[in-house]
Amino acid sequence: MIPREIKEVLDVVLRHNRWRRWETINLIASENVMSPLAEIFYINDFGGRYAEGTIGSRYYQGTKYVDVVEEALVKEFAEVLGAKFVDVRPISGTVANLATYFALVPEGGSVASLPIRCGGHISHSNVGGLKALRIKTVELPWDLENFNVDVDAARKVLEDKRPNLVILGGSLYLFPHPIKEVAEIAKGIGAYVLHDSAHVLGLIVGGVFPNPLREGADVITSSTHKTFPGPQGGLIATNLGDDANGQIQKAVFPTFTSNYHLHRYVATYITLVEMKLFGHEYASRVVENAKALAEALAEEGVTPVAERLGFTKTHQVAVDVSKYGGGDKVAALLEEANIIVNKNALPWDRSVVKPSGIRIGVQEMTRFGMGKDEMREIAKFIARVLRGEDPASVRRDVVDFRRGFVEVKYGFKASREVIEEVFASLNLLA
C-alpha cells in the first residue's frame, strides 16, 4: 500500500507533467525535452553508482561498464566538436565553468566577461562563482547598435587590464560573438578564450552556428540540455595541451565534483547520435522558427530587439516589454495563459531583478514539430495577452493548440518494437 503522502507528491508530479508536456507553450530558452528513447534509458543502474577518477583510473571498483560508456561519449563529442580533449563529468554548465576557471586562472587573477544585462551568465559574473573563487572580473564593452561585443573597445580594455581568461557566449545570445577577433587579441596578451556554448551547443552540433574551437577559442564549456536536447549535465572541450587539460581534469575531480550523475551518460550518448543524424534539420528549423516568431511579434506591434539586424541568428528572441509593465509582470501574465517565458535583463536595464525584457526560446516547441506557421500563432497568443485580454481566455486556446503537438520529433521513438530490437541485439531477451 503506497502511503498517502507519497500519493500526494506523485499527484503533483503528474499534474506538472500533464501541464508542461501537453498544455503549455514552453518558451524557456534554457530547456528542452529528450527523445522517448533517451528518456527510457535515462533510468538505469548507473544512477546509484560512483566512479570517482577518470576512465581507467577509478577510486571505486565495479566501474568497467561506466568506463566503456564514458569513453564512447567522450570520443563522439571530440569528433563532433573537433576537440583534442573532452570531459563529460561536470554535472552542469556552471560546474564546467567553475572547473575551467579554477584550472586556468591563477590565484589573484582576472577574467573578462559580459555583464548579465548584456547576456553574460551569472557564472561569468562577480555575483556568481567567480566571486566564490575570488577571481576579479573585467567588463567586456558592448556595442548596443550591433547587439554584440564591441571589438575595438574590447581591444583597449583587454590590452590595458590583461585578464587571464576571456569569456564569450552567454545566456542571452542572439548573434554569434566575434570569437576570431577576440581570440587574436587574447593571444597577444597571453590570455585563454573560453566560449560558453551552453545555449548554442545543439546549433553548433547541427552545423548552423560557428564552432568556437575552429574560430579560435581554447575551451568550450556547455550544458547538454538546451538546444542540445539531452539530459541535464555539462561538458568541457578543449584544444589545449596536456598540462592545461590535466589541470582541468583535476579541477573537475576532486575539486568540484565527486559523483558525476552517471545515469545521464546513456541518454546523452543517445541524444548525440540523434543529433548527428537529425541535428542539421532540427537546428536549421530552430533558427528559422526563432526568426519567424520575432517577425510575427513585430507585425503584432510587440517589440523584439535588434530588428535592424534581423532579430536573431539563434534559438532566442528578446522582447522589450517595458511598455506593458516590464519583464516580471509580463512573464507572470503569460504563464496565466500557459505560455512559459522568463523575465530577462536587456543591455539598457539598471536592474536584473525588475528588467524591461523577456527572453523566448523556440527549441522545445520546434522539437515537438512546430514550424513557422505555428510561430505566427504563438505570436498572436502573446499579443492577445499583452493587449489586455483575459489570460484565462487565451489559455483555453493555447491548450487546444498544444494538443496537436505532443510527439517529440528529430529523435528515436520508444515503441515496444524499438525496445525489443535494442534488447534483442544485446542478447538480453533470450
Swiss-Prot record:
(6S)-5,6,7,8-tetrahydrofolate binds at residues 120-122. InterPro entries: PyrdxlP-dep_Trfase, PyrdxlP-dep_Trfase_major, PyrdxlP-dep_Trfase_small, Ser_HO-MeTrfase, Ser_HO-MeTrfase-like, Ser_HO-MeTrfase_PLP_BS, SHMT-like_dom. The modification N6-(pyridoxal phosphate)lysine is found at residue 226. Its EC number is 2.1.2.-. The record marks 225 as: Plays an important role in substrate specificity. It holds the Pfam family SHMT. Pathway: Amino-acid biosynthesis; glycine biosynthesis; glycine from L-serine: step 1/1. One of its GO terms (molecular function) is glycine hydroxymethyltransferase activity. HAMAP family: SHMT. PANTHER family: SERINE HYDROXYMETHYLTRANSFERASE (PTHR11680), SERINE HYDROXYMETHYLTRANSFERASE 1 (PTHR11680:SF35). Belongs to the SHMT family. Homodimer. This is Serine hydroxymethyltransferase. It comes from Pyrobaculum calidifontis (strain DSM 21063 / JCM 11548 / VA1). The lineage of its organism: Archaea, Thermoproteota, Thermoprotei, Thermoproteales, Thermoproteaceae. The gene is glyA.
